[in-house]
Amino acid sequence: VLVVEDSKFACEGIRLLCLRSGARIRRADCLRSARRHLQVYRPSVVIIDLGLPDGNGTELIEEINAASPRVGIVLATSGDSFGEAVALAAGADGFFAKPLVSLSVFQEKILSLMPKDYAGTDIVRTVSNENVEPDLIAFQDDMAHAAEVLQKDTAAQQVEYLTLFLRGVARSASDDALLDATERLGVAHKQQRQLTSELACVAGLVQERLIDRTVV
């Protein structure tokens, strides 16, 4: 399984799901890295986050669909409510809404898309009701990344990326306060309003989570 995901917390959850399913995993944190992987490695399954630092995951979905031979199963994931429709329109075979922690949801989706006579899969053909719990150290890493983006650049493109990134992380971590603040930032950005107060609120919450590991 190749996971194209910039959030370490979300990727850790998928890693645990793959581990419980008997599948091997590789990670790419951006489109560029994913393209390098796909030049030398042909996975059975690709799971692509839609909000990546160097572009939209739909770009990679479309590229994979145009390739021959095509990767067997192409799945998308996002914390956005509109993500599924966008991903399927781009050619994804299926979609995972964040948070993705249910082993049964993960296994059932992949197994439903695999040929019944496919013997080469590393995914076991059994389904478990277990939920995985990603390590919060990965969440801290995501907060450090968000803080770096906030300090570096607040241009429109970066604000859009930051909103997508934090929305997915907040949903994956069930962090309602961070999710609410991120949603307000996203609305203000779409309305082309001044973002000073919304950015300050998000930055404050990110710093709180970097300092206090018990917040989430």
What are these regions (language model features)?
Residues 53:
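The feature encodes the CheY-like receiver
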Residues 27-45:
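Acidic, metal-coordinating helix/loop segments flanking the phosphotransfer/catalytic sites
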